[in-house]
Amino acid sequence: MESQNIRIRLKAFDHRVLDQSTREIVNTAKRTGAQVRGPIPLPSRIEKFTVNRSPHIDKKSREQFEIRTHKRLLDIVDPTPQTVDALMKLDLAAGVDVEIKL
């Protein structure tokens, strides 16, 4: 019989909130008897925006802004029914996007 995996992918703009949510998921999975692989840090996506500082002239004077999207990957190997139930009830911080694949 093939073992079942749960793959969890987390995204957030703030890496501290992302790491805290990752720790909560890992602790919950280990507490219910599942094996956890990860967290694996994935490459951060950096979006840069350049705008003119002045609304009228001075095209050479510009300002740059950036948004960094940090990502983590977790694999839960052979989850028990208690693991799935505990993960469904888990309340993560606001600002963390969670994608789950079975």
Swiss-Prot record:
Pfam family, one: Ribosomal_S10
Function: Involved in the binding of tRNA to the ribosomes.
Record keywords, A-Z: Ribonucleoprotein, Ribosomal protein
Protein name: Small ribosomal subunit protein uS10
Record-stated family: Belongs to the universal ribosomal protein uS10 family.
One GO process term, biological-process aspect: translation
Stored InterPro entries: Ribosomal_uS10, Ribosomal_uS10_dom, Ribosomal_uS10_dom_sf
The keyword RNA-binding belongs to this UniProt entry's keyword annotation: no
Source superkingdom: Bacteria
Single GO molecular function: tRNA binding
GO CC term, one of those recorded: ribosome
Subunit structure, as described in the record: Part of the 30S ribosomal subunit.
